[in-house]
Amino acid sequence: MHQYSETVRKAIGYWLILGCVLIFFQVVIGGVTRLTGSGLSITEWKPLVGAIPPTNETEWQKTFDAYKEIVQFKHLNQDMNLSEFKQIFFWEYFHRLWARFMGFAFIIPFAFFIYKKWIDENLMKRLGVILVWGGIVGLYGWIMVKNGLTGLYVPPVFLSIHLILALSLFAYLVWLATYMLRGHTPIFTLPSTLKRHGIAIVVLLFVQLILGGIVSGMKAGLAYPTWPLMNGEFFPSALNTLSP
């Protein structure tokens, strides 16, 4: 590891931890956006000028009219009025605005660290991964929304991929922040067997997160609204009679 000064290590490490906090809240905001059915309320992707919301009734009506053209409005929300539209618009707008804020929270300190020559070639590559990865998450978010404009909802698989991309970026930031703050000093040591088990648990966790996103997106949990058993059974008797 490059011999960074303690000041540099802490500055970059805590900056990365801030990124983790921002991603955490972005995932929460994204979850609220999905639960309120707000994700398709903004039918355009304008990374720069889209930061400015409608400012008068004419602009609001124009934005609402664009929403009226998609399938979701025609089949699910045809009785929605402008006031109700503003409520779902808020969450999707807030979700996108937070993403822009995250971008500035990364780029401005990143540029400062480069100016101060605090970043060597190795760390530059690792931080570059964050920049590209974050861009991919944002771009995929729009691809996901655009795909959903032709249906009633955003496809659940798309939602799960979007979530996993964000959580993977979160995990990468945690690892890199720990690397900067502690260097080669491990927080604790584990036997190789436990390390392998730990990796297996992480893989299973990610699979469960993917499945959870799909179940949530399809509202499949409503089929068995009991816990911990499914209508009193560990393996529901209807399992063999059901098909996708």
Describe the residue ranges of each PLM region.
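Membrane-interfacial catalytic/cofactor-binding modules of polytopic membrane enzymes
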Residues: 210-244
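Interfacial segments of alpha-helical transmembrane regions
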Residues: 11-22, 122-131, 187-210
